[in-house]
Amino acid sequence: MINPNPKRSDEPVFWGLFGAGGMWSAIIAPVMILLVGILLPLGLFPGDALSYERVLAFAQSFIGRVFLFLMIVLPLWCGLHRMHHAMHDLKIHVPAGKWVFYGLAAILTVVTLIGIVTI
């Protein structure tokens, strides 16, 4: 028999943010680490391409702000979702764990948004 009043789950929203963050962390973050952390210090990347003025101009553009926001927020949601489920799997039950982890992710998302807007 079909339940006439099904309980709606909020889990698809969090799984979507987790999946997007995991994909971003797997594809975009390693490229940024390679460019900024390895190629640039070794001198294998043109030095003026990532000069302070150019990076600041990019960070202040709309596309740059969106990129920075996604670079911070998506892996954050992925990591906190993973921590929430890891603690559940280890039978460590945090009181109101969903509120703790997803609330922290939401608060840090707002803080990041404020920081990105004020650049």
From Swiss-Prot:
GO molecular function, one term: succinate dehydrogenase activity
This protein's record includes keyword Transmembrane helix: yes
Keywords (A to Z) from UniProt: Cell inner membrane, Cell membrane, Membrane, Transmembrane, Transmembrane helix
Keyword NADP (UniProt): no
Alphabetized InterPro entries for the sequence: Fumarate_red_D, SQR/QFR_C/D
Membrane-spanning intervals of the chain: 26-46, 55-75, 99-119
Membrane topology of this protein: Multi-pass membrane protein
Domain of life per record: Bacteria
Coiled coil: none
Compartments (UniProt record): Cell inner membrane
GO biological process, one term: fumarate metabolic process
GO cellular component: fumarate reductase complex; plasma membrane
Function: Two distinct, membrane-bound, FAD-containing enzymes are responsible for the catalysis of fumarate and succinate interconversion; fumarate reductase is used in anaerobic growth, and succinate dehydrogenase is used in aerobic growth. Anchors the catalytic components of the fumarate reductase complex to the cell inner membrane, binds quinones.
Assembly mode: Part of an enzyme complex containing four subunits: a flavoprotein (FrdA), an iron-sulfur protein (FrdB), and two hydrophobic anchor proteins (FrdC and FrdD).
UniProt family annotation: Belongs to the FrdD family.
Protein name: Fumarate reductase subunit D
Organism: Escherichia coli O139:H28 (strain E24377A / ETEC)
Gene (UniProt): frdD
